[in-house]
Curated annotation (Swiss-Prot):
It comes from the Bacteria. This is Protease HtpX homolog. Binds 1 zinc ion per subunit. The chain crosses the membrane at residues 6-26, 40-60, 163-183, 198-218. One of its GO terms (cellular component) is plasma membrane. It holds the Pfam family Peptidase_M48. The keyword Zinc applies. Zn(2+) binds at H148, H152, E223. Belongs to the peptidase M48B family. It is a multi-pass membrane protein. The active site is at E149. It comes from Leptospira borgpetersenii serovar Hardjo-bovis (strain JB197).
Length: 295
C-alpha cells in the first residue's frame, strides 16, 4: 500500500511539473521570464516544494491540531466505561470489519451533531464524534456515522485530499508569481517591488479561492465513496438512517438544536448559497445516492 502511495505521489508531482512546463511553453512565457531575470525552472521547483510540502506538513500535524483545536478527549480503553466504552467498542468492531488498524477514538464536547476522521495514514488515524451526536442519535445511527468516517480512513482520503491540495497550492503560487512579475515590469523601476508584492498577495488570495472550488469538488466525490463504504460495513439502511437524522437535525429550528449546532465542514454541510465551495454534497443527494445503490 505504501508503495502505491509513493508511486501516486511521484506520478502526481511529475504531472504537476509537466503541466506547468507545457502551459508556459504554449504561452511562450519561458523566454520572456529568462530575459527579465526570472528563472522558470527555479520557480517551478520552489512552488512545487512549498505547495506540496506545506500540504503534507498539515497532514502530518492533522491529528495534533484536531485534538488541540476541537478539544478532543481521547478514550483510554483501559479506563473507559459507559458511553465512552461503548463508543470505543463500536469503532473497534467496525475497524476490524474494515481490516483497519485501530484508530484513536475521541469525543469533543459540543452541541453540534457531527464527527470527523483525520490523521496522516491508516495506521495513525483519529475518529472523533461530538457529544451532541451521541445525545441525538441512536445506536444504529451512530454506527452509520462511524462507518462513514472509517471508510474515509480505509479509502485513504486524507492522503488523497492532501495531494489535491498540494497541487492546487503549487499552481496558485506559480501563476500568482508569474502574473505579478509580469505586472511589475509594466511600471517604473521604483514601483516594481510594491506592484509585485501587492499583486502577488491579491492574486494568491484570488487563485486560492478559485482553487478551493476544485478541492471542494473532489471532497464531495470522496463523501459519496465514504457513504458507500459505510453502507458496506453497517448496511445501507443504517447509513441512510444516520443521514436522515442529520437532515432532520439541521432542518430543525435553531432553538431546538442549539446556536452552536450548525453545519460544519466534517460530516454535514448546509451551505446552499455557496454550493461550489461546500466540501460535502447536500444530505438529500447523499441519501438518494444510497437509495439508488446496491449496498
Amino acid at each position: 500500500m505504501w508503495f502505491k502511495r509513493i508511486g501516486l505521489f511521484l506520478l502526481t508531482n511529475i504531472l504537476v511539473v509537466v503541466t506547468i512546463s507545457i502551459v508556459t511553453s504554449v504561452l511562450g512565457i519561458g523566454p520572456y521570464l529568462d530575459a527579465n531575470g526570472l528563472n522558470l525552472s527555479s520557480l517551478v521547483i520552489f512552488c512545487f516544494l512549498w505547495g506540496m510540502g506545506g500540504a503534507f506538513v498539515s497532514l502530518l500535524l492533522s491529528k495534533f491540531m484536531a485534538k488541540m483545536m476541537m478539544g478532543v478527549q481521547i478514550i483510554d480503553p483501559r479506563s473507559a466505561s459507559g458511553a465512552e466504552r461503548e463508543l470505543y467498542s463500536r469503532v473497534e468492531r467496525l475497524a476490524r470489519a474494515a481490516n483497519l488498524p485501530m484508530p484513536e477514538v475521541g469525543i469533543y464536547h459540543s452541541p453540534e451533531v457531527n464527527a470527523f476522521a483525520t490523521g496522516p495514514s491508516k495506521s495513525s488515524s483519529l475518529v472523533a464524534v461530538s457529544s451532541g451526536l451521541l445525545q441525538v442519535m441512536d445506536n444504529a445511527e451512530v454506527e452509520g456515522v462511524l462507518a462513514h468516517e472509517l471508510a474515509h480512513v480505509a479509502n485513504g482520503d486524507m492522503v488523497t485530499m492532501t495531494l489535491i491540495q498540494g497541487i492546487v497550492n503549487a499552481f496558485v503560487m506559480f501563476f500568482s508569481r508569474i502574473i505579478s512579475y509580469a505586472l511589475s515590469t509594466m511600471v517604473k523601476d521604483e514601483m516594481q517591488y510594491t506592484v509585485r508584492l501587492i499583486s502577488n498577495i491579491v492574486l494568491s488570495i484570488l487563485f486560492s479561492i478559485l482553487g478551493s472550488i476544485v478541492v471542494a469538488y473532489f471532497s464531495r466525490t470522496r463523501e459519496y465513496r465514504a457513504d458507500a463504504g459505510g453502507a458496506k460495513l453497517v448496511g445501507r439502511q443504517n447509513m441512510i438512517a444516520a443521514l436522515e437524522k442529520l437532515r432532520r437535525t439541521f432542518d430543525a429550528p435553531e432553538d431546538e438544536r442549539g446556536k452552536e449546532a450548525l453545519a460544519t465542514m466534517k460530516i454535514s454541510g448546509h451551505n446552499k448559497w455557496m454550493a461550489l465551495f461546500s466540501t460535502h454534497p447536500p444530505l438529500e443527494a447523499r441519501i438518494a445516492a444510497l437509495k439508488n445503490s446496491g449496498y
